[in-house]
């Protein structure tokens, strides 16, 4: 019986983690859809092309390795 409590607690934490991950992925998908629905009337074609190329890229992630000094 003593082992049941930690097992149940672990399962609940896993379920919560998976559901919050799914919700954040859903929010990111909605944000990408909103960026795709921008009204571009009255804007030059070259600027529209640059905006669409930027919006097609995945969101930037911080990479601490990019700031490390190399010993070479």
UniProtKB/Swiss-Prot annotation:
Expressed by the venom gland. Keywords: Bradykinin receptor impairing toxin, G-protein coupled receptor impairing toxin, Hypotensive agent, Phosphoprotein, Secreted, Signal, Toxin. One of its GO terms (cellular component) is extracellular region. Belongs to the non-disulfide-bridged peptide (NDBP) superfamily. Residues 1-24 form the signal peptide. This is Hypotensin-1. One of its GO terms (molecular function) is toxin activity. It is found in: Secreted. Residues 25-35, 61-72 form a propeptide. One of its GO terms (biological process) is regulation of blood pressure. It comes from Tityus serrulatus (Brazilian scorpion). Disulfide bonds: none annotated. The modification Phosphoserine is found at residue 41. The primary structure of this cryptide TyPep-1 is identical to that of cryptide Pep-1 from Tityus obscurus (AC P0DRE6). The record marks 58-59 as: Important for potentiating BK effects. Residues 53-72 are annotated as: Disordered.
């Amino acid at each position: 019986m003593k082992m049941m409590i930690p097992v149940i607690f672990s399962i609940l934490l896993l379920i919560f983690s998976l559901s919050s991950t799914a919700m954040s992925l859903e929010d990111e998908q909605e944000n990408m859809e909103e960026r795709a629905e921008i009204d571009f009337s009255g804007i030059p074609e070259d600027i529209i092309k640059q905006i669409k190329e930027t919006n097609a890229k995945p969101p930037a992630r911080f990479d601490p390795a990019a700031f490390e000094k190399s010993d070479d």
